Amino acid sequence: FQPLYENTYNPPYYKELFENYGFQNYFNQHTYLRRLEVGQLSDSVYERVKRLEESPGYCFKHISKKNLEQVAEDFRLVYNKAWALFSGVKAMDREQAFRIMNILRPIIDERLIYFAYYNDEPIGFFIMVPDLNRVIGSFNGKFGWWNKLRLMWALKVAHKADRVLGLIFGVTPEFHGKGIEAGIIREFEKA
């Protein structure tokens, strides 16, 4: 099994090795792999989506790279409402949000970043990127100009990344429990 992009893989003996040096586990972060096919979502997801579709004002759509500044601002607004309330998480300013989107720009696939809106105000997002490990695994740890070109060709022309990695998901607190996450996932399924 090849780990997802940005997820470490360490042989089993690493745990004991690090613990012998005095390191301790800080927290467990789990990543799940699931194959998604059209029509595979549970009936409850489709029911919640149907209720949303019957309610006026809700809109779900993927982004356009031509409008990345607005995407960054929508991301910031939802992030600050959904994530900045957690301890250890700071609010994000405009520059930081725009910097994040610019860093992601080369690998962004517009069909992998979705926003939810209510009366044209952003209320949720799901940001995914192609799993780069499927492509860069053959680079043997080297990332010079030639491998950068190979990566861009594999992502933009050959579409060799056949898995995606969900980076972050957020819904503003006032819309929790209303099925916004179901609407975003259903929109992704339709694409």
Q: Model regions: which residues?
A:
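Acyl-donor binding region in acyl/amide transferases
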Residues: 1-23, 27, 140-191
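Flexible glycine/acidic-rich beta-alpha junction loops that bind and position SAM and/or redox cofactors
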Residues: 28, 34-35, 132-136, 175
